[in-house]
A protein has these predicted regions:
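Conserved alpha/beta catalytic core and glycan-binding cleft of carbohydrate-active enzymes
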Residues: 16, 32, 37-202
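Active-site groove signature of glycoside hydrolases
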Residues: 5-31
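Active-site mouth loops of central-metabolism enzymes
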Residues: 1-3
Length: 202
């Protein structure tokens, strides 16, 4: 814990960075019995240390352990990846869900983040991330095709909620390519319009 916090202070005070994103952040707040502790010393030190005033703290609020899914529970001072937003928007633009949840997601996902009087910026909205399907994959494939890496297509999630627009993979069909471009624009628009912080991956 001390090494992590000392490293963070160095990056803030010496390098001038303005925020951190914690991969599998729930791992950092487990106690010695591997239980999730939302009042963990790691979070308390960050909240109390003036070096971290006005520094953005962004959690990927889950890990692989028991009760690791902690979306909406990191509390004030933290923003969190909103995978409910990601999943819903992917489903919405595939036409598999209705509009009832759309207003909730576009208005900052208050069902997840309002419990501890958190602002809409607590929701980090995203469609794609550094792992899984890219935006182009989302509109080009119904299934993953990770066959060239020696893992026999076992790696990566099978729950991609994608739509190939009529043809699996690359195509020269102008109509399908036009539809794919429109679908990508739809996804990007719903990433830029809602309350909360957008996360855009290249």
């Amino acid at each position: 814990l001390a090494l992590v916090l000392d490293s963070m202070r160095y990056w803030v005070t010496e390098m001038g960075i303005d925020g951190f994103r914690f991969d599998l952040a729930t791992t950092l707040i487990r106690d010695s019995h591997h239980h999730v502790d939302q009042n963990h010393p790691f979070k308390r030190v960050i909240a109390d240390d003036p070096a971290f005033d006005d520094i953005k703290m962004i959690a990927e609020p889950w890990d692989m352990g028991p009760f690791g899914y902690q979306v909406g529970r990191f509390g004030r001072g933290w923003s969190e990846w909103n995978d409910r937003y990601r999943g819903f928007m992917r489903d919405y633009w595939r036409g598999t869900v209705g509009v009832q949840e759309l207003a909730t997601r576009l208005s900052g996902s208050a069902d997840l983040f309002d419990g501890s009087d958190r602002p809409p910026s607590a929701s980090i909205n995203f469609i794609t991330a550094h792992d899984g399907f890219t935006m182009r994959d989302l509109v080009s494939y119904n299934h993953k095709h990770n066959k060239a890496n020696g893992e026999h297509n076992r790696d990566g999630s099978d729950d991609n909620r994608s739509w190939n627009c009529g043809v699996e993979g690359e195509t020269d069909d102008e109509g399908i390519n036009a539809l794919r471009h429109r679908q990508a624009r739809n996804l990007i628009a719903t990433l830029l319009l809602p309350r909360g912080g957008p996360m855009i991956t290249a």
